Amino acid sequence: MLKRAFELKGYHVVEAEDGQQALDMARRYHPNLIVVDLNMPVLDGLETIKHFRKLEGEGDHTPIVTITAYDVYGMEEAAKENGTNAYLTKPLDLDELDRALKGLGFIV
């Protein structure tokens, strides 16, 4: 559903199966936006965000949208401390996704 929503907006989407693959793909493709699920195998979403931000170093940062079905107390703060720019919960509301993307400067 999420991939299709982005494709309908004209975005090219590349999917990763796990956090490590997401990092490898980010190095290779240099995306304009990263969408991370907190519940991923190999490296979870928080670890993936943390490693990605370390790879980026100083300067401009690729926007990261974090999505989760496990919205437990403190999780949003932890995601933001690790470098996420927008935090959304499942079930995903596509209007909420649009607002988050607009807030990050994307045309939706």
Label every PLM stretch briefly.
Residues 3-8:
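Charged docking surfaces used in two-component/phosphorelay signaling
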